[in-house]
């Protein structure tokens, strides 16, 4: 409703496309006044805009020249995931593209990130889990059934949701049942289905069944959200990219004291994969490969990881965090409080050793 054309047949490639006279001033005024009224009547009310053109200022306060919505939906993210699932081989999942899509937003607007919504759950479309596993969901979801397609689907489902949820700058959205990989679509009674109620439901019992794999996804989602909630103002913490490499298919970023590491490669695991992070000791707090979540348990999460000192990055206050990254897994590590940790002591000792060596070499040169 922001445009006389409803945005149909228009490409929004530059800011000039948002201010070319095609905008419906009455509609914009209506939305602005509506937001102003809503927040005056109820200061705790939240308004969210679902808009595809990317109109600037939509989720900016009226006092700051915006339209007054509290959030806008990050509609590019679910479109990206569906596109990559439909068109790309696992070997062609590029972390640089994933990073761009999940963090592509204006700094002054808060967004609601989501991997999928009701659009994918309704009849006629497919949810992420169904695109990953398809009909094998009906035959191989027993907890003790090690079926390749199901194992792949569970692993990627967790990784997709983790990277989407932990790169938010506003909020995270989930459509009921998708968090545990509900196997069927939703179809409300209508003439086309004979007014049937068969698919007008969510089978909540699936996630509670100990003999089925749905509980693995449900448990992971619960732990993931608990981690996010445990960090004060998580959504406001800067998202800082540590590393991405499309060849390795590895992505890493930081928020506060947390490091998020993803290996999207379907076949390549890495030993001692180095990432430059603030020096210290890191402990794994969430791992998609944890057996509790249907993973293979290929890493020992009880191990604390100490960064290695490198004089080249001393001024940047960074050291090498060396990790084992199994294929198609992701982990979250927390930097422990710096109570003169062993890694710090090692770093200081290494610095003194390097300085002593340099002084010794300099003294030799002076003698010569």
Walk through the language-model features, giving the residues of each.
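C-terminal beta-strand-rich structural cap/linker in extracellular carbohydrate-active enzymes
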Residues: 256, 301-340
